[in-house]
UniProtKB/Swiss-Prot annotation:
The gene is gag. It comes from Feline sarcoma virus (strain Gardner-Rasheed). Gene3D superfamilies: Gamma-retroviral matrix domain. This is Core protein p15. A lipid is attached at G2 (N-myristoyl glycine). Specific enzymatic cleavages in vivo yield mature proteins.
Amino acid sequence: MGQTITTPLSLTLDHWSEVRARAHNQGVEVRKKKWITLCEAEWVMMNVGWPREGTFSLDNISQVEKKIFAPGPYGHPDQVPYITTWRSLATDPPSWVRPFLPPPKPPTSLPQPHSPQP
């Protein structure tokens, strides 16, 4: 029997009613067909490392946001509801997203101040 691999995109589609409700709670509307197109094509073509299957990596989401929120004719205001909803899933994940979150980055240690030697 064939098994399908669950990806961040397929996961959001499997829970589409919850994704739409989350967007609605943020005051925006998202459409399934556009969600798929943005994830599989538009964001991939931005050449910022977005994978076709989607990701809950905040680094990748931030890179896409930089393109979407770019000023003037370079931005993509029509995509704002989609990337903000995607970020919301990554930063405040429902139980079905948690197993797909990337592992947290180890904290970077800051240099410790040296006490003066007598």
